């Protein structure tokens, strides 16, 4: 479900001409997951910019929760003036509105 949701968000980013990037996790041979980045854990998975706006957002299932590390990033980033979101499939109308502004 989250993969379909992510695909829909990515399609909308493209259609609305956002410059965007998604940090995708990778699976190790032992089956564990990691995101090959240096620094502190928990950075939002998506970054997008258009017309002077900067968005950082995390996509979650309807029951998914941010980790403690993600909450720290969200709090710190909210002080910068960037738009910080946690989006779920039920947020689709708001997502469309946000990416269409």
Where are these regions (language model features)?
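Catalytic phosphate/metal-binding cores of nucleic-acid and nucleotide-processing enzymes, i.e., regions
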Residues: 1-101
């Amino acid at each position: 479900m989250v993969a379909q949701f992510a695909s829909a968000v990515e399609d909308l980013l493209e259609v609305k001409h956002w410059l965007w990037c998604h940090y995708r996790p990778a699976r190790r041979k032992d089956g564990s997951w990691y995101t090959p980045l240096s620094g502190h854990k928990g950075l939002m998975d998506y970054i997008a910019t258009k017309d002077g706006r900067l968005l950082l957002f995390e996509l979650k299932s309807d029951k998914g929760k941010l980790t403690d590390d993600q909450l720290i990033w969200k709090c710190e980033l909210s002080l910068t003036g960037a738009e910080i979101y946690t989006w779920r499939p039920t947020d689709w109308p708001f997502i469309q509105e946000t990416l269409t502004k």
